[in-house]
């Protein structure tokens, strides 16, 4: 018998990082957003999903985003930057209240039925 076969040599095997990662629990997931519009759109999609109004959701998000005042859009963008470092759910709730107040103050040139989400 070949002497090399008697003492096997274990070689390191490179495994992809995806196999070593554990599946995240959805409840503890903190998403990192690239910019303010993506954060805004994700929150609005969640609200639209809960209210059942999905007709043209992406177009509505874009229309609403462009009708928001510059300072509100800047606040969403700063919040998206902050999401890289910490959980921003409380701050998102504050900005959603601003969005609701804009909708209730006659800023309604788009058809959107939003139910209040706690």
UniProtKB/Swiss-Prot annotation:
Major site of localization recorded for this protein: nucleus
DNA-binding segment(s): 29-97
Subcellular location: Nucleus
Tagged with keyword Repeat: no
Sorted UniProt keywords: DNA-binding, Nucleus, Transcription, Transcription regulation
SMART domains with a match to the protein in the record: HMG (SM00398)
Any GO CC annotation of this UniProt entry: nucleus
GO molecular function: DNA binding
Protein name per its UniProtKB record: Mating-type P-specific polypeptide Pc
Organism of provenance: Schizosaccharomyces kambucha (Fission yeast)
């Amino acid at each position: 018998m070949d002497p090399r076969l008697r003492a096997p040599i274990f070689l390191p095997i490179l495994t992809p990082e995806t196999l070593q990662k554990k599946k995240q629990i959805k409840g503890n997931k903190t998403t990192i957003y690239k910019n303010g519009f993506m954060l805004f759109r994700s929150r609005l999609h969640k609200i639209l999903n809960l209210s059942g109004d999905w007709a043209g959701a992406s177009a509505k998000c874009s229309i609403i985003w462009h009708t928001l005042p510059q300072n509100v859009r800047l606040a969403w963008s700063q919040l998206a930057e902050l999401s890289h470092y910490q959980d921003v759910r409380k701050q998102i709730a504050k900005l959603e209240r601003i969005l609701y107040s804009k909708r209730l103050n006659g800023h309604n040139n788009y058809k959107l039925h939003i139910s209040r989400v706690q």
